[in-house]
Amino acid sequence: MKCPYCAYGESKVVDSRSTEDGSSIRRRRECLKCNRRYTTYEKIETTPILVIKKNMSREYFDRNKMVNGLMKACQKRPVSRKQIEQIADEVERHISNEMLTEVNTDKIGQIIMKNLKKIDEVSYVRFASVYRQFKDINTFMEEIKNLMDKN
């Protein structure tokens, strides 16, 4: 790897450790020419995942899009950013464990709803209303009744 300061091609690793989530390795390097230090990250290369949308079009999986949708559902609710990130992690873990290269939005929505229901029922109903495309108040009432029956 070339030094970002002098572009020399050789360096030594001074320190190496896993990142907090264990998904990559952080390395402190020292250039053998200019002796300046810099940080690099080593991460497993993954195959891009395609999401099959309801209209059968495909787009690349976008974690940020999923997190933003969750944040809207959880707005002004007692759900932390960390909990939202954990749900997103669970979706990614599920896709990765099943070694899927394509996944439909139904599967993603089911995983999100299963996890969101455990955290906050109001956020769950909000998310479900968009995901399942509730058409009227009766659909909301039906979902709320199902939640209450299970409790």
Curated annotation (Swiss-Prot):
Gene Ontology terms: biological process: negative regulation of DNA-templated transcription
CC cofactor note: Binds 1 zinc ion.
UniProt KW Transcription keyword: yes
Zinc finger (unnamed): 3-34
Cited HAMAP family: NrdR
Entries under NCBIfam families matching the protein: transcriptional regulator NrdR (TIGR00244)
Family the entry assigns: Belongs to the NrdR family.
Protein name per the record: Transcriptional repressor NrdR
Source species of the chain: Clostridium botulinum (strain 657 / Type Ba4)
